[in-house]
């Protein structure tokens, strides 16, 4: 893709899912990112954890933890974006969502611009089979949901107590939907970010490159992939959990650090997710995704999801 700002020939950024994040396990990672000139996006939970639902990734620090809040505020002051990953680690009715968003605003001085749904929260917007538009995709999604026994997702269902779609549309500019096994997301989703008229409560969607933990992240941005991203003039929005193996005992994973250092020496645009998506919108006049592109994107995601169920 041509037309990046300044001398940049490609773009790279990261959306960090807050699951499991603490000051101790992600702090060193952000120091590394900052020192190398990357400005990325970190998500947070504004409300305290629901203790009965802290299994798996549904744990970590929140904006109610004083030292963690100071850390998050410092990151924002340094140019990182702070985004939303739902208002907490469990289901939230409309009033809880409103309270969480207000706390986010009170602590950081503004509402979040970027959001991703959290795992199986019932307040997720267009999640589960709601992510899919094609009939074949929805059928496959329903089969998957049956076998996984997932709960309904109702953040976009106006009759539900979990509805907050109108609030999402009012405050949130960008929501992540699919993750793909590709470093250059514009190869599979050239209309980035995109609006889907079938999902009116989301202003714009974006697609990410899968790299959930340090191993898959490093494999996704290996040397050959970096060079291809640069050669193609592509865009990479990594989706990851910096809490999952990126630092141990205060020391950043050496392979991760080496790959980032190499990438930082290239002529890339290294800005947060919302800033990158804002820029991309200035380069085109049409933001509505066409059926063929969306159907192809869905098929690719479904195939990847079947092979790697943990993918988001």
Could you say what each language-model-derived stretch is?
Residues 1-201, 215-238, 246-312:
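Catalytic alpha-helical scaffold of carbohydrate-active enzymes acting on polysaccharides/glycoconjugates
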Residues 198-210:
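Aromatic- and acid-rich polysaccharide-binding/catalytic face
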Residues 243:
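Short, glycine-/Ser/Thr-/acidic-enriched flexible segments
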